[in-house]
Curated annotation (Swiss-Prot):
It comes from Homo sapiens (Human). This is Tubulin polyglutamylase TTLL5. The record marks 186 as: Essential for specifying initiation versus elongation step of the polyglutamylase activity. ATP binds at residues 180, 186-187, 208-211, 221-223, 268-269. The gene is TTLL5. Polyglutamylase which modifies tubulin, generating polyglutamate side chains on the gamma-carboxyl group of specific glutamate residues within the C-terminal tail of tubulin. Preferentially mediates ATP-dependent initiation step of the polyglutamylation reaction over the elongation step. Preferentially modifies the alpha-tubulin tail over a beta-tail. Required for CCSAP localization to both polyglutamylated spindle and cilia microtubules. InterPro entries: TTL/TTLL_fam.
Length: 1281
């Protein structure tokens, strides 16, 4: 694949490939380079990691651009490359465009690089990045060129070799010194000393004089991290990024010796100070001067406000960087010439750490080989993402498939006859030789630039020098936020004598890049003035604020939609990278590659006197322009005419849309229903795009995964509820939890796209119906449709969210978005809606009602915007929880069913627990005229911990709502769906019931109660369709017929005496394996009863006021009884006793008959036992934690466990029958009354496990608690059964 390619200028575009080339010429990610602008180079956009624009990815994907990362893990680099269509290959692969490594490269790897391949390190870069080598190189330059010329390091000694010199210096000045390992980073192994005896000489270390007069801001010490890019060492080309980081210590600076060991005071490394408890981080990318990490521009602006000379400061910083790199230039340039086959194969980003003292003199601390690209704060992401994107653009990745390379020879014109770039047009002539191609390139360039421009500038240059000259010019055209500090128009005169690598390339660049610069002979003051103006320009660039990625994204989209960006014959800059100054406009006017953007002044083509006279006119305006203009703005310099008065004409693109919809809505305007639906559809499309994007630069941590999981859960909830209101059936296939996170996001995005399609169709149908009626209400006029459509095309997700939130707040309802009902009843295994069409539409309107926040920022990254439209239920649920602790009189709100976090049947896993309350079946259901109110809730086999009333459910990696698995079909009920449905819902209250009441009607005496902490309180307003209830009852009837019930389920506590009869057939074994018989009341044909005895007080207890009953001792309804009641009410057949005795259990029948005959005696027994043990058990009730509450991890469904043959968890010993009672299976008559009295009298007072005591405690606890509605629990461990 040739890098320099000639083309026939007379060739016409006649083939389809020609048309493709033309269509790609204006692509925002392509910049054309080479002699005839035939070589496409990729342009990177920092905001691509947020947008995941397919238009940006298409170039990289088309040419199979690839990268590999070796011995490091840079998520930011990976995310930027992936967003631009690159794909990652194995570290051992040889087909790549970029190798990003964290260590030095071996010579044999460098030798095999092709011209299109690039690596991020130069050979022998350790000459700069190792502290000992850096020290030696600078000391050598001090000896050669003078100490003052290279006095950029504090006084330093290399130990143990120079220990004697160090002791001699210490004896003269007993100040503090700082010790550093020669090859470490991030502050590891760094400490301060004030005596040579404190130093360990076991390894090589560097000892430097501690700068005890650092520049302080608010009494805190700080240093500056600068990002320096070197693209070539022969010739030397250095760029400094216009933004950096100021890193502050976390403890106020104090020179006292007592604080010499306090690293948080003396060290400014982020890796050290982030461990301090005083470290402050800023979460707003727009705030750059807060916390322990500032932007460099914010620091410079602060110093300028304090009256400091920031222009001179940054000029000294540039001087320090240039001299540092020059000190290692010879060694690195020699290694490049030896090992690197192509000049453009290597580039390197250095991290310079500079400390500024109180006199504004910068001191070099160290140079980092691979500066940290971690983004621990939004400010890091804004600066580092912009810097990396601009660096990749400057380096220049040629759009070429790495697998198609045919040769690795260093002379790249010889690629001409081997491979062609797919972008390039087919040549009708024969392949050109290297010399022919180069000459034709030069001719073509001369034609494009005009006679006398570039044509004359290359006279006398070799082919290699021409290629180097063109590459350096093209790099500067793509520099973005980088500022080229070497070479400039003055650097050769200042630093030329310091260069040790004696080649002609540096001099060639100095003379050819700035060949038109004014000679300063006889006018040295003009030379100084030119230097000052250049320094002011650079200082203004360093001080201006960097735009956030979100603003860049909006600006680029706005400029692309308007298509107003002018085209230049040389530069095709992206929107973010067009930072135009007066000197840059001169370059665009002349369209010559040999003009320097930042260093060239307009007066260079005029006389010295003319510069002196007119420089005062444009220099202040230039500085003011850059200071008041943010980086990467959209201003365009249209004209720069020196002869016409040196005025700068600016054309500013309008960033704000002309049509301000929010202003119209606030001025009593309104949207029509169709416009509201269109805006909502556009919002959902933004959400879909956000789901389809990759993780970007986010850290794959537990918190990030939890947040992503929560966002997907919001989408799932929305789809389930919204699809239920569609007129058309829509199948929702939800992703499995076993899939990868990104794969689940992709599936959800696909499902959301399907929903949007159906939603848009229904919107069109609604529009057609309205157009046929020809009757429009006054409020349906809405805003101007053309302006509205333009707003929809340009609006961002944040703007749409703001409009929809305001519209919902203004109209008091969001039902227009999703409707209020559907034609048919649509249910799923997680939620239900009203079965009848039109039933309580206000219910759904309340569910989708949006509660906007009090304050809303449109510039934030909206990662959870969908929750504004789907989680209003959560907001109402929190209000319910906060009020639930107020007692039975707490008013319950209506909560949408989408807040249901999990739905469990007997074989499903539990979800987060919420407090629930009882509700009643409407009396209007024909098939159930007298059915008592029940709850068809189930409890999972392993109950999860419950939330305390009023507690807030905070998402966490292990405890947040999960994305449901399986398929969700809108259509008729299946048996499984209906079962899950009826077991996960509460029956709604009748319309005559008092709003917010949680009590049961006292006339409904046959009520069974239950608690379930996995259910939400969000289903109060829901009703069952009659057909749905009938289907479920039929299923329960079939289940009842085939189920074998445990006999122990319906034997009262009095049957404990039967255990002394030694019953046969294993009845007692099953009884002990199940729950205590006391907890399982018998359900008689006439209704549920609590005892087989005739208790005259029972009806009174059943109908007593609920307010007088304890919540801790409330009654419970077991699943078996609930199903039996449902069965009896549905079929009209009175079910038999749940225990059907077999042929071998006749002894039990006899025992029960005997018990019936002993009712009066038992009653007397109870009275006497109560009187005898009143002193022991009188003050005791049955605690929740001992009798009624099982362990959270234990199984709670006793009836199900018994029916399935599994052993449920046994209760405490004091309610379990004595082991001796089951020693024999021979039935015996019950003991007479006198024997029982004697036995009870002989029992010790400390024993509370006797049958009489148990019966007394149980009876006293059950009687006052019969049929108490359980609204909430005050015991965190209270497990609802």
């Amino acid at each position: 694949m040739p890098i320099v390619m000639a083309r026939d200028l007379e060739e016409t575009a006649s083939s389809s490939e020609d048309e493709e080339v033309i269509s790609q010429e204006d692509h925002p990610c392509i910049m054309w380079t080479g002699g005839c602008r035939r070589i496409p180079v990729l342009v990177f956009h920092a905001d691509a990691i947020l947008t995941k624009d397919n238009n940006i990815r298409v170039i990289g994907e088309r040419y199979h651009l690839s990268y590999k990362i070796v011995r490091t893990d840079s998520r930011l680099v990976r995310s930027i490359l992936t967003a631009h269509g690159f794909h990652e290959v194995h570290p051992s692969s040889t087909d790549y465009n970029l190798m990003w490594t964290g260590s030095h490269l071996k010579p044999f790897l460098l030798r095999t690089l092709s011209e299109a391949q690039k690596v991020n390190h130069f050979p022998r870069s350790y000459e700069l990045t190792r502290k000992d080598r850096l020290y030696k190189n600078i000391i050598r330059m001090q000896h050669t060129h003078g100490f003052k010329a290279f006095h950029i390091l504090p006084q330093t000694f290399l130990l143990p070799a120079e220990y004697a010199e160090f002791c001699n210096s210490y004896s003269k000045d007993r100040g503090p010194w700082i010790v550093k390992p020669v090859a470490s980073s991030r502050g590891r192994g760094v400490y301060l000393i004030n005596n040579p005896n404190q130093i360990s000489l076991e390894e090589n270390i560097l000892v430097s004089r501690y700068i005890n007069n650092p520049l302080l801001i608010d009494d805190f010490k700080f240093d500056v991290r600068l990002y320096v890019l070197v693209t070539s060492y022969d010739p030397l080309v250095i760029y400094l990024y216009e933004e950096g980081l100021a890193r502050f210590a976390t403890v106020r600076y104090d020179q006292g010796a007592k604080n010499i060991r306090n690293q948080f005071m003396h060290l400014t490394n982020y890796s050290v100070n982030k461990k301090s408890g005083d470290y402050v981080s800023c979460d707003d990318p727009e705030v750059e001067d807060y916390g322990n990490k500032w932007s460099m521009s914010a620091m410079l602006r602060y110093l300028k406000q304090e009256g400091r000379d920031t222009t001179a400061l940054m000029a000294h910083v540039e001087d320090l960087i240039i001299k540092t790199i020059i000190s290692a230039e010879l060694a690195i340039a020699t290694a490049c010439k030896t090992f690197v086959p192509h000049r453009s194969s290597c580039f390197e980003l250095y991290g310079f750490d500079v400390l500024i003292d109180s006199t504004l003199k910068p001191w070099l601390l160290e140079v980092n080989l691979s500066p940290s690209l971690a983004c621990d704060a939004p400010l890091d992401l804004k600066i580092k993402a912009s810097m990396i994107s601009d660096m990749f653009t400057v380096v220049g990745f040629v759009c070429q498939d790495p697998a198609q390379r045919a040769s690795t020879r260093p002379i790249y014109p010889t690629f001409e006859s081997s491979r062609r770039n797919p972008f390039q047009k087919p040549q009708r002539c024969r392949p050109l030789s290297a010399s022919d191609a180069e000459m034709k390139n030069l001719v073509g360039s001369a034609r494009e630039k005009g006679p006398g421009k570039l044509g004359g500038s290359v006279l006398g240059l070799s082919m290699e020098e021409i290629k180097v000259l063109r590459r350096v010019k093209e790099e500067n055209d793509r520099r973005g936020g980088f500022i080229r500090i070497f070479p400039t128009s003055e650097t050769w005169e200042i630093y030329g004598s310091y260069l040790e690598h004696k080649t002609s390339m540096n001099y060639m660049l100095a003379t050819r890049l700035f060949q038109d610069r004014m000679t300063a002979d006889g006018a040295p003051e003009l030379k100084i003035e030119s230097l000052n103006s250049k320094a002011k320009l650079h200082a203004a660039l360093y001080e201006r604020k960097l735009l956030s990625l979100e603003v860049r994204k909006r600006r680029r989209r706005s400029s692309r939609l308007r298509a107003m960006r002018p085209k230049y014959p040389v530069i095709t800059q992206p929107a973010e990278m067009n930072v135009k100054t007066e000197t840059e406009s001169e370059e665009e006017e002349e369209v010559a590659l040999d003009n320097e953007d930042e260093e060239q002044e307009a007066s260079q083509e005029e006389s010295a006197g003319f510069l002196r006279e007119n420089q005062a006119k444009y220099t202040p305006s230039l500085t003011a322009l850059v200071e008041n203009t943010p980086k990467e703005n959209s201003m365009k310099v249209r004209e720069w005419n020196n002869k016409g008065g040196h005025c700068c004409k600016l054309e500013t693109q309008e960033l704000e849309p002309k049509f301000n919809l929010m202003q119209i809505l606030q001025d009593n305007g309104n949207l029509s229903k169709m416009q509201a639906r269109i805006a909502f559809s556009a919002y959902l499309q933004h959400v879909q795009i956000r789901l389809m994007k990759d993780s970007g630069g986010q850290t794959f941590s537990a918190s990030w995964a939890a947040k992503e999981d929560e966002q997907m859960e919001l989408v799932v909830r929305f789809l389930k509820r919204a699809s239920n209101n569609l007129q058309h059936s829509l199948r929702m296939v939800l992703p499995s939890r076993r899939l990868a996170l990104l794969e689940r996001r992709r599936i959800l995005a696909h499902q959301l796209g399907d929903f949007i399609i159906v939603y848009n169709k229904e919107t069109e149908q609604m529009a057609e119906k309205k157009s046929k009626k020809k009757v429009e209400e006054e409020e349906e006029d809405g805003v101007n449709m053309e302006n509205f459509q333009e707003f929809i095309r340009q609006a961002s997700e944040a703007e749409l969210e703001e409009v929809l939130t305001f519209y919902t707040q203004k109209n008091k309802s969001a039902s227009v978005f999703l409707g209020t009902h559907s034609k048919i009843s649509k249910n799923n295994n997680n939620y239900s809606d009203s079965g009848a069409k039109g039933d309580h539409p206000e219910t759904i309107m309340e569910e989708v009602k949006i509660k906007p926040p009090k304050q809303q920022q449109t510039t934030e990254i909206h990662s959870d915007k969908l929750s504004r439209f789907t989680t209003s239920a959560e907001k109402e649920a929190k209000l319910v929880y906060s009020n639930s602790s107020s007692g039975p009189t707490a008013t319950l709100q209506k909560i949408p069913n989408t807040h249901l976090s999990s739905v469990t049947t007997s074989d499903l896993s539990p979800g987060p627990c919420h407090h629930s309350s009882l509700s009643q079946i409407p009396s209007a259901i024909p098939s159930m005229p007298h059915q008592p109110t029940i709850l068809l809730n189930t409890v999972s086999a392993s109950a999860s911990p419950c939330l305390h009333p009023g507690a807030q459910n905070i998402p966490s990696p292990t405890g947040l709502p999960r994305c449901r698995s399986g398929s969700h079909t809108i259509g008729p009920f299946s048996s499984f769906q209906s079962a899950a449905h009826i077991y996960s819902q509460k029956l709604s209250r009748p319309s005559s019931a008092k709003a917010g009441s949680c009590y049961l009607n006292k006339h409904h005496s046959g009520i069974a109660k239950t608690q379930k902490e996995g259910e939400d309180a969000s289903l109060y307003s829901k009703r069952y369709n009659q057909s749905m209830v009938t289907a479920e009852l039929q299923r329960l009837a079939e289940k009842q017929a085939a189920r074998q019930y445990s006999p122990s389920s319906h034997i009262n506590l009095l049957t404990q005496q039967v255990t002394n009869l030694n019953l046969a057939t294993g009845i007692i074994n099953r009884s002990s394996a199940s729950a205590p018989p006391t907890l399982r009341p018998i359900i008689s044909p006439s209704g549920p009863t609590w005892s087989t005895q005739s208790d005259p007080q029972a009806p009174e207890n059943h109908s007593s006021s609920p307010g007088s009953r304890s919540l801790q001792t409330g009654g419970f309804a077991w699943e078996g009884e609930v199903e039996n009641n449902v069965y009896s009410q549905a079929t009209g057949v009175v079910p038999q006793h749940k225990y059907h005795p077999t042929a071998g259990s006749y002894q039990l029948q006899f025992a029960l008959q005997q018990l019936e005959q002993q009712k009066l005696q038992s009653r007397q027994l109870l009275d006497q036992s109560r009187a005898r043990h009143q002193a022991i058990f009188g003050s005791q009730t049955l605690p929740n934690s001992n009798l009624w509450t099982m362990n959270n991890g234990a199984g709670c469904r006793i009836s199900s466990a018994t029916a399935s043959g599994q052993k449920p968890t046994t209760l405490p010993q004091k309610v379990v029958p004595p082991p001796s009672s089951c020693a024999s299976l021979v039935p015996k008559p019950p003991p007479n009354h006198e024997q029982v009295l004697r036995r009870a009298t002989s029992q010790k007072a400390s024993k509370g496990s006797s049958a009489e005591g148990q019966l007394n405690g149980l009876q006293s606890s059950l009687n006052p608690a019969a049929f108490v509605p359980i609204t909430s629990s005050t015991d965190p461990a209270h497990t609802k059964i």
